[in-house]
Amino acid sequence: KNINNEVVRSFWSEDNEKFEDGNGFEQIEPFIKNKTLVGYNNYYYDDKMLVLMMRGLKPTDLHKFNDRLIGGDKCSDIKIPAWFKSLDCMQQIGVAHPSLKQIEGNMGMSIVESEVSFTIDRPLTEEEKQETCEYCSYDIQATIEIFKLRKHSYFDTKESLLKLYDNSKAARWNTTTISANILLDYPLPKWNRLQIPEDKWKHVDELPTPAYEMWKYAESDPTYKGTYSEEIFDCDIKFAFGGLPGENVNEHWFEDVKLLDVASMYPSIIINLNVLGRATNVYQSLKEERLKIKHVDKQKSDALKIVLNSVYGNLKNQYSLLFNPLASATVCIYGQMALFDLCRRLYHADYTLININTDGVAFKDNDPNSPLRNFMDYEIIWKQWEQDWNMTLELDEFDTWIQKDVNNYIAIKDGKVKVKGAETNKYNFN
């Protein structure tokens, strides 16, 4: 089918012999050359089966490879020709790797299953052929709809990444792998210790000792996933190896709330700590280029955003060139230290902390007329913090903020509602 869901060609072969109408499997190759095929999970199944069909394998042999692929065998002996172009709509669709049938259900489509058994050992009847074609046609229709939904958000951006990398071998890679290879063509040297600059510890002198000890333990075991929670600054704060979640323990409803977010926090930390070594300068130039073109060339900007944001995840990916567990732990700890310091400064300036997340702090002013405001106003704290941590904060403001906990809240600004969390986002107020 084409993008308009119109059937442009059908291929059928009982014994892979050449039919008079020229629609046997031997006709697939000349038809698909110079075209880009789109499928769902085709990088792991359909593409390989098509290659075998074009080789002229008998149905009995095709069935054996089918069973191997479905059984989890990658069949790496099946080589995809260099001219063969395809896109896989399943690529990076989500950590759950939903099946096509699951997506059809989520899209409100009917779940159509074939009544024709996959174990028939005889030629299909005309009626069975018709039903099989209808079954395949329906799944292709669903694949077309998925492709349309992901074209701009994923495939256009991936195409921009491929232009940046300029390597034909990368066409089937996911965006995370492409991003790593844009920055490096060799494995990143691994750190043998945490590398928090000594001058940063003075800003977190109120850090709970168990949290510090937990972080230091990661030096001997980078896979350590411990957590520690404590009530501090009138918030229940959880220290771990992710964000720094925390919420006010006294109230749930707040007025006139300000939110300071760290702009591009992980990319900024990666640059500050020179995590990528020689490639850090390249990384920084990509960050600066994205800021310049953010409102001019959105597609390229989105591609650069993927490169920038994928690095932190790749530091934890053992299959990536960027794999560096202690660097990952350092970036995480550095970010939590910076957020903890911002919380500390605001709290001691008599601001009420409301919500603390991975890269931001929501707070309110208890007493705008306090003498403290002459030298501890949040704007002064803001600029001092930026100077001390070499990162940038961005301000947002809300009229009302109502929260159940750190991950479930409703924030209202100028009559518009922002919601977060499973307890709130099922409601649509706008």
Segments from the language model and where they lie:
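Entry/capping segment at the start of metal-dependent catalytic domains
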Residues: 1-8
